[in-house]
Structures are given as C-alpha cells and as structure tokens.
UniProtKB/Swiss-Prot annotation:
Protein's name according to its UniProt entry: Small ribosomal subunit protein eS19
SMART domains: Ribosomal_S19e
GO molecular function, one term: structural constituent of ribosome
Name of the encoding gene: RPS19
GO biological process: ribosomal small subunit assembly; translation
Family designation: Belongs to the eukaryotic ribosomal protein eS19 family.
Alphabetical list of InterPro entries matching this protein: Ribosomal_eS19, Ribosomal_eS19_CS, WH-like_DNA-bd_sf, WH_DNA-bd_sf
Cellular-component GO terms for this entry: cytosolic small ribosomal subunit
Keyword line: Ribonucleoprotein, Ribosomal protein
Length: 149
C-alpha cells in the first residue's frame, strides 16, 4: 500500500499540487482573478498571486477525502465570518462562481468528473495524480534498527 493524500500534511500537499497545476500550464487562469473577492465577507482580494491554483488544489484534496461534493458544499467550506460592525457576526458563504469555474477547469483536465447522483468526484486519473504528488512530498523514513533489550 502506497502513500495517499491522507498520509501527508494538508498544507504541504496543497502547495505541491498547486505548483504541479501551475507548472503543467494546462489550467487557464481567468483575468478577473487579480481583483475578485473570494466571498462577500471579505474586504480585499487574496494577496497570494497563485491563489487560484491553491484553491484548485484544495478543492481536489477535499474531493479526495469526501466525495462527491457540489458547489454548495464548497461555498460552505470556504465561507467565513461576516463582520457587521457593532452588530453580531454571522456566517456567510463563499463565492460560488469561483468554485464552479475551478471545477469546470478541473473537469477539462480530466481530474474531476460529474457524479450521476449530483456533485463532482475525482476521476481515476485525478486520484492517481494526487497520490503521486503525495508520494513525492512524503518524508523518506529510514528503516529503524531493531531494538535490543
């Protein structure tokens, strides 16, 4: 049994898979990504220049762990606290258009496919790509010497 996505750190995996998506050059980044907010609860657009690839990698990881998932579930996952000044804060969903466009572009790369029961799921090729990236970043453990008692 090899290394899977569940065996590595989520942060390291997301960064590595985002770099893989960016390096492949097959995923087109829309021009509106420089100035769009990721939700109505945000004040500014993301500071990270590669946030689009990072969000795509994060979506792939979520689909690996819990599949199938639709646009609404990603709105909830990436949602946050809306600050309303002196009024109490409330939860607010994230932008669904970003999740939808990302899933459509991942479908074009044959990483994600539509599930017949609703939502999206990883393809076998997508699962294989994710496991391969996870195996590359997994720490190489040296075999430990047997303990003598």
């Amino acid at each position: 049994m090899g290394i899977s996505v569940k065996d590595v750190s989520s942060h390291e995996f997301t960064r590595a898979f985002a770099a893989f998506l960016k390096k492949s050059g097959k995923m087109k980044v829309p021009e509106w990504t420089d100035f769009v907010k990721t939700g109505m609860f945000k004040e500014l657009s993301p500071y990270e220049p590669d946030w689009y690839f990072i969000r795509a990698a994060s979506i792939c990881r979520h689909l690996y762990i819990r599949s199938p998932a639709g646009i609404g579930s990603f709105e909830k996952i990436y949602g946050g606290r809306r600050r309303r000044g002196t009024a109490p804060s409330h939860f607010c969903k994230a932008n669904g258009s970003i999740s939808r466009r990302l899933l459509q572009s991942l479908e074009g790369l044959k990483i994600v496919e539509k599930d017949p029961n609703g939502g999206r799921r990883l393809t076998s090729q997508g699962r294989r790509d994710l496991d391969r990236i996870a195996a590359q970043i997994a720490p190489k453990r040296a075999p430990s010497a047997p303990k003598t008692v």
